[in-house]
Each structure stands twice: as C-alpha cells, then as structure tokens.
C-alpha cells in the first residue's frame, strides 16, 4: 500500500484531463484508467459466458468472475464469498431483501423501522412491502446532530418490530449513525437489520462480521467501478431462507413441468446471464484501490470539504448541512433557489448536484426544499475548492439583490 499522493491519484482518471471541476462523486465516481482498461479488454478479448460453457476461455472467465466475489468478501470481511450476491446496484439489493426475505415473513401489524435520513432506495422498498403485507413503517427521527436518533430505538421497538433499515452514511449530510449500537438494539429484539452502504462503502467499508450486520448493500459505480453492478451481502442462513425473486437459467438445480429445485445461495438469486463486464470492472477497481491508503484518501477529501465550507461560510446567507466533518457538503444560501445557483455553476464549469437528492423526508426534516451538494473525492484538489468558491461568488452577484 502506497502513501496517498493526491496528484498521483488524480492522474489515474482520464475524465479529469479536461478543465471541468467534478464535485458530484456522491452521485457517481469517475473511473480510473485501470477500470476502463479492464472493461475494454473484457469486451475486446473475452469469449464465452460464465457458469455455462466448457471451453477453456469460458472456464477462465468463470474463475475471474468468482474471484471478484472473493475480493468483495475481503473488502467487507465477510466470512464466505458465498454471502455475496451480484445485483444491479444498491436499489436492487434492498428491493431483493424486501421482496425475497421480508415479504414472505411480514404479517399485518408488523413493523419496519426506517430512519428519516434514508435515501429513497432504503425507504420506498419498505413502503411497498408494507402495502403488500399490511405491515407498517415506523419513522426513526433525527437527533440534534442531524443523525438518526439511535438512542430512541428502545422506545420505538415493540414486540411487532421485525426489520430495521438504516444507512451507513447519509448521501445529503454525510452523517454516520452509530451502527453498532443500532444493530445491538435491533438484535436484542430479534429484528433483522438492512444497512444501506451505498455511500459508506466508498469511505469506510463496513466490517460485516464485527458489526454483526444481517444485510449490507452497495453499488460499484460509486466505488470507482462500472455502472450496473451492485452487491448484496447477507448472512448465509438469511440468504438461504430467501425465495428467489427471478426465475431462469443457472439459478435452478432441476426443472420439470412438475416443478423445480433451486441452487444454493448466492446463485439461486442470480438468474440469467449476469453483468460479467460489471463484475470484472468492479474487481479491477478493488485491485486498484488496494494500492492506496483509503484512510489517508478520506482525510484529504474531508479537508477539501472543510476548506470549501469555511470559505463559503464567509458569504452572507450561507447555511451548511454537513455532519461530522464529512467529505459531503450540502449547503444553500438564504433567498437563493438551489436550481438557479446550480444552473449558473454549471455554466461556470462546476459539476455538482442540487435538489432533494432522493431524500425528500430528510430534506423536509431539515426544513428545506432542496440544497446544493458538493461531494469531494480523493481526486479533487484545492484548486477545485477555489474554483467552486469563485463560481459561487459570481452566481451570488447575479442572484442576490
């Protein structure tokens, strides 16, 4: 592992060769050359499909495909690579848990506790399964620090509480609840915990054994990998208890017109031809990341967010919604609509996001209709911070009387 060098890290990203300033990594990360090359080589040189053909190239491809599963298991300190299921992304992973695990077990009146800080991907699937089963969704509110109020869980948990859905890291504030404490409360009541790791996996991948996590989901594209590939980790006994969501090739053991028997997990949950290119690309991203000190890289990103926050705080009307010195900086200006601001920033070459960030209940709790969000990554620089601040100043001159 090398000492983190921002300039060397940045040089690995072809998309940064232009003059733009990219501050939207919380939406999707840019891709390093290693991932671009691995994906290109797959499409250029690979032949065959995984877990199907018997010729040598197909067998080698299957081995690479399964080796990637092992890499993800190592990233999360999962006890077994068979606890790793390939999906299209975090959203599909959570929906799979809701439909394949929760739906067959929930009864009318059962409760699903969901934090108000959740991305819609960790709320809407639970609202859907509640409608389907007669269960109800119970809101876990924020505390004074704008974090899910984990200390309220003992009051919210009842004999009907079945599932806790909690994000590792907010995609708006960057706040991280005390997962260990929340999981302890939930497990003491016999609940199953679904952790949304879409943001957290990028900054500090969860140790699923140490935290005793039941289900954990993340997406490859936020972790410098390709789009369309995601991960669901589940404890072995929970995955085996899940009914397959999709039926088709390679998820079955035997099939007749009288019925079928499924493969064991994870393959019973992976019907059809998988996103092999996505798996190969994610594997390349993890191999590439292993050469860097993630903690040092995270410290760099956080320092840039702090520089930006401190500079913008000198402008009238500035409000920050940032938590815990995160690398995500959600902010707004009094009297300035976020859509107007982001439009001007785009004209000035600054790429960031504005709006509700797929977290409408959280924005309502924060008392705003939307915010701007600058999300800093290890490939960003102090020059990017200066460019953001200068662009904001130009925009404020036009937008504020």
Curated annotation (Swiss-Prot):
Its cofactor is pyridoxal 5'-phosphate. It catalyses: (sulfur carrier)-H + L-cysteine = (sulfur carrier)-SH + L-alanine; L-selenocysteine + AH2 = hydrogenselenide + L-alanine + A + H(+); 3-sulfino-L-alanine + H2O = sulfite + L-alanine + H(+). It holds the Pfam family Aminotran_5. Gene3D superfamilies: Aspartate Aminotransferase, domain 1, Type I PLP-dependent aspartate aminotransferase-like (Major domain). GO terms for molecular function: cysteine desulfurase activity; cysteine sulfinate desulfinase activity; hydrolase activity; pyridoxal phosphate binding; selenocysteine lyase activity; sulfurtransferase activity. Cysteine desulfurase activity is increased 2-fold in the presence of CsdE. GO terms for cellular component: L-cysteine desulfurase complex. Keywords: Hydrolase, Lyase, Pyridoxal phosphate, Transferase. Its EC number is 2.8.1.7, 3.13.1.-, 4.4.1.16. Optimum pH is around 7.0 and 7.5 for the removal of selenium and sulfur atoms from L-selenocysteine and L-cysteine, respectively. It comes from the Bacteria. Induction: Induced in persister cells. Changing residue 176 to A: No loss of activity. The modification N6-(pyridoxal phosphate)lysine is found at residue 222. GO terms for biological process: iron-sulfur cluster assembly; L-cysteine catabolic process; selenocysteine catabolic process; sulfur amino acid metabolic process; sulfur compound transport. Homodimer. Forms a heterodimer with CsdE. Catalyzes the removal of elemental sulfur and selenium atoms from L-cysteine, L-cystine, L-selenocysteine, and L-selenocystine to produce L-alanine, and transiently retains the released sulfur atom on a cysteine residue, in the form of a persulfide. Can also desulfinate L-cysteine sulfinate (3-sulfino-L-alanine), which is the best substrate of the enzyme. Functions as a selenium delivery protein in the pathway for the biosynthesis of selenophosphate. Seems to participate in Fe/S biogenesis by recruiting the SufBCD-SufE proteins. Belongs to the class-V pyridoxal-phosphate-dependent aminotransferase family. Csd subfamily. This is Cysteine desulfurase CsdA.
